[in-house]
Amino acid sequence: MEVRFLLFLLLLVLVINPSLVVNMVFGYMFGLLLRNNYSRLKAMIRSNQTEEEEERHEAVDVSNPFEDVDIDVMQHLKTLGLDSKVDEEDVEYFRRFWQSMLRNK
């Protein structure tokens, strides 16, 4: 077909039904968002955990927060003087810092 004929048909559709074009633009934007966040959306759908289970899983034992820490990390904490006692505020700070690092990967 000729390009002018196709453009004329598109113009005719725009004049008759402009909501179709608006729907097409919104669909395109939704598709872009879905394509960029598809892996996160898949993980959310496959996950059957509730928010309470996630919070329980992420809870840190304040009595011994260094239970699963590597040796080199412990040595670095000793040089900073943080190996013996950690306040709850520090644990919250470390948790927020770790979450921000995970988000910015």
UniProtKB/Swiss-Prot annotation:
One GO location term (cellular component): membrane
Domain of life of the source: Viruses
Residue stretches spanning the membrane: 5-25
Membrane topology annotation: Single-pass membrane protein
UniProt-annotated location(s): Membrane
Keywords: Membrane, Transmembrane, Transmembrane helix
Family, as annotated: Belongs to the nanovirus U4 protein family.
Name of the protein: Protein U4
Organism: Faba bean necrotic yellows virus (isolate Egyptian EV1-93) (FBNYV)
